Design a protein with these regions (language model features):
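Membrane-embedded alpha-helical bundles of multi-pass transporters/translocases
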Residues: 2-464
Length: 464
């Protein structure tokens, strides 16, 4: 009788895992990425210029922090990933991390944007290093389980595509709002005191970050069967990952994504402030890209339906992103505004399609790995995806800081031609070429819809 009840429970769980995800859960999952962006996009777009132009920290110190902090990530990301796999609560494996991690991370975000320009350079660097490293850890504790949650909500490949579309559309809306309102909000809250303006915005965004993740926690549900807990040595898990070719390509895609996207984002405010002459243009630019970004994200399922391959879909979007970003080099919002904003809109239309596709790949790679090796370690795999993205981010932002510092960047001053040239190319041609390279790499992704369905059939037969 006990065996019959267990069998019925497992069958029920499997049916649920292949079923439709309720609309409110899709909405809540998307809201999770709204929260993520109100912290991490704020950090990616504004923290570097906050450190150099508001806090008064040298460009070389900022570059060093961005690189050194990745060693910290290399330690904490796999640990957090393993801990999420070992978490077993009445709420599931991943959702509890949102409940407890989001409020704490929101507080650390506020502390990170609390400037003390009157301190000594040594004190500033210590404060920067401590708050940033704790912020990175807190973000990992929330974002890693959040990203893995998609694979626990359903095993249906089309439902996962819809979940990731909801995530990406929500993210693009959040990014647009952040980019449009942040500069005016800093000015409005600060009333002439930029230091206070940044702090007030951090408080607001921290509240939004926590609220979105708490909503995500309450309205989502983990239905995929939790595997029997296995005590697997690190080398065994690493070996299983190395045999997962689709996952390795997804990891490479995330590394390149982090390098290109966050490096360019860190440059954008410098570009508009110093090359084009006005930080206000950044808000106009953001207004031009918000609607195309949302539409581009929503187009992912349509393109995927035609290709049947998420990796190839990502490659198409990446290639077109690269072409349009290279085109941006030849136009200026001051001299050729229509063409500048047209190419900006197109580049973000294609980028948001890529953004949806590259995250939609990850849950499918987990099932491929389970089918290939017999090991299912969602959290561990997502940890290295997160780490790859962060390493890319660190390399992109630190190389930008090193290049600007070496060329003679001086905060809040007229920049020399070499500095302006670096800012211009970092906004257009460099990311454009790198997006085309990314497209070439993702063309080798072979896990298509037909193969995935066969993998799921094989896995279900094994469970029976």
């Amino acid at each position: 009788m006990e065996q019959d009840s267990k069998f019925q429970a497992n069958c029920s769980l499997e049916n649920n895992s292949q079923g439709k995800v309720p609309f409110i859960s899709k909405l809540a999952y998307g809201m999770g990425d709204v929260g993520c962006n109100f912290s991490w996009m704020f950090v990616g777009n504004f923290l570097m210029i906050f450190y150099t132009d508001v806090f008064g920290i040298s460009m070389s110190a900022v570059a060093t922090l961005m690189l050194v902090s990745r060693f910290w990530d290399a330690i904490n990301d796999p640990i957090i990933g393993t801990l999420t796999d070992k978490t077993h609560t009445r709420w599931g494996r991943f959702r509890p991390w949102l409940l407890f991690g989001a409020p704490i991370t929101a507080l650390v975000l506020i502390l990170t944007f609390w400037a003390h320009p009157e301190w000594s350079q040594t004190a500033k660097i210590i404060y920067m290093a401590v708050t940033y490293c704790i912020l990175v850890l807190g973000y990992t504790c929330v974002n890693l389980p959040y990203g893995t949650l998609c694979g626990a909500m359903t095993q249906d490949i089309d439902e996962r595509a819809k979940l990731n579309t909801s995530r990406s559309v929500s993210a693009m809306m959040a990014i647009g709002v952040i980019n449009i309102v942040t500069v005016p909000l800093i000015s409005w809250f600060g009333a002439g005191d930029t230091k206070y303006g940044y702090l007030a915005v951090a408080v607001l965004y921290g509240i939004i970050f926590a609220a979105c993740h708490l909503f995500c926690f309450h309205k989502t549900k983990e239905v995929v069967e939790v595997p029997v807990e296995q005590k697997l040595p690190l080398k065994v898990q690493l070996r299983s990952v190395m045999k997962n070719k689709p996952y390795l390509l997804a990891l490479l895609g995330q590394l390149l994504f982090g390098f290109i996207h966050y490096g360019r984002n860190a440059d954008m405010l410098y570009y508009f402030t110093y090359v084009e002459g006005s930080a206000t243009l950044f808000s106009y630019y953001s207004m031009a890209i918000i609607v195309p970004s949302i539409i581009g994200a929503a187009c992912f399922p349509l393109v995927f339906r035609k290709t049947g391959n998420k990796g190839f879909t990502a490659a198409i979007f990446a290639f077109l992103t690269g072409i349009t970003m290279i085109g941006l080099y030849f136009f200026s919002p001051n001299g050729s505004a229509i063409l500048f904003y047209l190419f900006s809109a197109l580049s973000w239309f294609f980028f948001s399609g890529f953004n949806t596709a590259i995250y939609a790949i990850i849950p499918d790679c987990v099932e491929y790995g389970e089918w290939k090796t017999g090991i299912r370690n969602d959290g561990f795999q997502y940890a290295f995806i997160s780490l790859g993205n962060k390493i890319g981010m660190a390399l992109g932002t630190s190389l930008l800081a090193i290049a600007l510092g070496s060329a003679g960047y001086v905060s809040n001053a007229v920049q020399n031609p070499e500095v302006l040239s670096i800012m211009h190319h970092a906004f257009s041609t460099i990311p454009g070429v790198l997006w085309i390279i990314t497209a070439g790499c993702l063309c080798f992704y072979k896990l298509n819809k037909k193969q995935y369905k066969q993998i799921m059939t094989d896995l279900e037969n094994k469970k029976k």
